[in-house]
């Protein structure tokens, strides 16, 4: 793998935050990266080989002055296998959600999973030609009613089967923890203005309370 990128370009308005007072707070939520973007960030880290060497990030609150946390985050990631990753996420898109896209670029393949919530395979090209790109794109072309899509259903089914058959689940809690670690590292880098090396320890969103005041 050479590099991968995760782009989350969504809209969250005042009404969205008014519906739950914990949203956008440092104590109970975080901002765009922690809430809206973390699933694609999780995918990026998992697909790129998981282990990270270092990250540098920038965050800001450009529009949502009624929340505590960021509404824009950008990060550059260096993985231990030599590959790179880019994260770009925002809730400032007008007037509605635009896209959630994952790009993967390797020596012998290119993948683009797009749509509003990584629900459509838009590019699938590999040198081994084991799969027909058109067939893959036709098979993975969901049209969910909202950005939540159907992605959780197979994960729940796998966990149930894992419990019933006494096997390890396909994705465990440690994978979720690693996605959380990456977002916290981006926050840390943005706050200090420096590169953050992995692993990180003793970091919490509460540390960033008041950052954009």
Label the predicted regions.
Residues 1-67, 193:
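Predominantly a Rossmann-like dinucleotide-binding segment in NAD(P)-dependent oxidoreductases
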Residues 182-192:
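Short arginine-rich
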Residues 7-12, 61-63, 81-83, 91-93, ...:
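Glycine-rich beta-alpha junction loops
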Residues 38, 64, 88-96:
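Glycine-rich phosphate/pyrophosphate-binding beta-alpha loops
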Residues 40-41, 156-157, 183:
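A general structural signal for well-ordered alpha-helical segments in protein cores
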Residues 1-6, 86-89, 113-115:
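Beta-strand scaffold of nucleotide-dependent catalytic cores
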Residues 66-69, 151:
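Short loop/turn motifs at secondary-structure junctions and domain boundaries
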Residues 74, 79, 101-174, 196, ...:
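C-terminal glycine/acidic-rich active-site capping loop/insertion
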């Amino acid at each position: 793998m050479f590099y991968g990128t995760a782009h989350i370009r969504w809209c969250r308005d005042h009404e969205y935050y008014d519906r739950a007072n914990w949203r956008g707070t440092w104590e109970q939520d975080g901002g765009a990266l922690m809430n809206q973007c973390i699933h694609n960030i999780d995918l990026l880290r998992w697909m790129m080989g998981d282990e990270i060497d270092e990250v540098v990030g920038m965050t800001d609150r450009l529009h949502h002055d009624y929340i505590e946390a960021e509404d824009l985050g950008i990060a550059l990631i260096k993985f231990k296998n030599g590959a790179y990753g880019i994260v770009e996420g925002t809730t400032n898109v007008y007037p509605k959600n635009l896209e959630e896209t994952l790009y993967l670029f390797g020596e012998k393949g290119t993948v683009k999973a797009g749509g509003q919530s990584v629900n459509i395979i838009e590019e699938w090209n590999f040198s081994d030609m084991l799969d027909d790109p058109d067939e893959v794109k036709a098979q993975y072309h969901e049209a969910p009613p909202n950005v939540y899509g159907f992605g959780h259903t197979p994960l729940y089914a796998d966990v149930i089967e894992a419990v019933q058959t006494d096997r390890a689940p396909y994705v465990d809690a440690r994978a979720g923890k690693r996605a959380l670690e990456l977002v916290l590292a981006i926050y840390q880098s943005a706050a200090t203005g420096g590169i953050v090396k992995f692993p990180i320890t003793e970091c919490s969103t509460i540390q960033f309370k008041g950052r954009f005041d």
